[in-house]
Amino acid sequence: GIFLDKLKNFGKDVAGILLKKASCALSGQC
């Protein structure tokens, strides 16, 4: 339903932010 869709989108956003932070930290470009 709507709740699960929102949860999935939220999870994607969080995962994307974490991935950006991780790649930024690994490349040392923070």
Swiss-Prot record:
Subcellular compartments: Secreted
One of the GO biological process terms: defense response
Any single Pfam family the record assigns to this protein: Antimicrobial_2
Swiss-Prot/TrEMBL keywords: Antimicrobial, Disulfide bond, Secreted
InterPro entries, per database record: Antimicrobial_frog_2
Disulfide bond entries: C24-C30
Tissue: Expressed by the skin glands.
GO CC term, one of those recorded: extracellular region
Protein family (similarity comment): Belongs to the frog skin active peptide (FSAP) family. Brevinin subfamily.
Stated role: Antimicrobial peptide.
Protein name listed in UniProt: Brevinin-2Rj
